[in-house]
A protein has these predicted regions:
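Residue-level signal for the nucleotide or nucleotide-sugar donor/cofactor binding architecture
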Residues: 8, 49, 53, 75-81, ...
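NAD(P)-dependent short-chain dehydrogenase/reductase
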Residues: 20-74, 80
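Glycine-rich Rossmann NAD(P)(H)-binding loop
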Residues: 39-41, 68-77, 99-107, 131-135, ...
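Mid/C-terminal beta-alpha module of Rossmann-like enzyme folds, strongest
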Residues: 86-132, 141-142
């Protein structure tokens, strides 16, 4: 395992909390470090959100006719359905420890945007990301989790989920 070096207070606090929990609960705790989840939230209440997700920002911008040029940027994403499958396996196997829950590979935002925009019939313009936007690229190593629960986690599953989201969102908007 690699040495963790959090670079912001939020990350430092999460790591500090993990250490306290591990110290107090030893081998009776499951800590999940979850990547960006992608799914349809049919029960969305935007008034209660702490921050916007990538999907929130994407659909807000696409409604304005804007898509950001994200050619070089990548992150790690996981469909909400795959996340549910992973959680179910973890519960059934009574797993304890610390695990990264993710696809475990780079997902270029351009590719993700193309999937999410598949059913969009409206015109839009592609613009460069403003310099002021924070564009941190990362992906999580999920080898430990995949070995533990023996599950297949594939990019094609994320692609299918994104296309289903696109169909759901744009079919509703195009009516």
């Amino acid at each position: 395992s690699s040495k963790l070096k959090p670079n912001c207070n939020y990350s430092k606090n999460k790591l500090h909390t993990e250490k306290i929990l591990l110290k107090n609960l030893k081998n009776r705790i499951l800590i999940l470090r979850i990547s960006n989840l992608i799914g349809i939230n049919k029960f969305r209440n935007n008034n209660k959100k702490i921050h916007k997700t990538f999907i929130d920002s994407f659909f807000l911008n696409v409604q304005r006719g804007i898509i950001f040029n994200n050619e070089k940027n990548y992150k790690d994403f996981l469909s909400i359905n795959k996340f549910g499958e992973i959680i179910e396996k973890l519960i059934n196997k009574k797993v304890v420890g610390i695990y990264n829950v993710s696809l475990g590979q780079k997902v270029y935002l351009t590719k993700l945007v193309n999937w999410l925009n598949l059913f969009n019939k409206n015109k839009y313009k592609s613009i460069d990301i403003p310099k002021s936007y924070k564009t941190e690229c990362f992906y999580l190593n999920n080898d430990k989790l995949m070995k533990k629960i023996n599950i297949k986690n594939r990019l094609i599953d994320l692609e299918k989920a994104c296309k289903a989201i696109s169909k759901f969102f744009f079919k509703k908007k195009n009516k």
